[in-house]
């Protein structure tokens, strides 16, 4: 899993809601928002499931399109 910016206490300490730092970051994310911890957990859950049984050796970017 290669996460993008995720809404955490540490993230918000550096980039408060509405700050210039947050606005600048959001210009680099096509979905125009930061990710939620649950979204990373959901990606991990999928990769651990039988549905992902034939997936090997991959990096899954969970970053709102920031790596495009």
List each language-model region with its residue ranges.
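A glycine/serine/threonine-rich, flexible loop-to-helix segment
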Residues: 5-28
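Conserved beta-strand segments that form the floor/walls of ligand-binding pockets within enzyme
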Residues: 30, 61, 67
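Short, small/polar-rich loop/turn modules that mediate ligand/substrate recognition or access, typified
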Residues: 55-57
């Amino acid at each position: 899993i290669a996460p993008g910016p995720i809404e955490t206490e540490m993230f918000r300490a550096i980039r408060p809601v509405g700050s210039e730092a947050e606005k600048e970051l959001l210009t680099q994310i096509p979905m125009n928002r930061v990710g939620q911890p649950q979204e990373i957990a959901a990606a991990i859950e999928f990769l651990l499931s039988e549905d992902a049984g034939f997936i090997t050796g991959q990096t899954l970017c969970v970053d709102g399109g920031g790596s495009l």
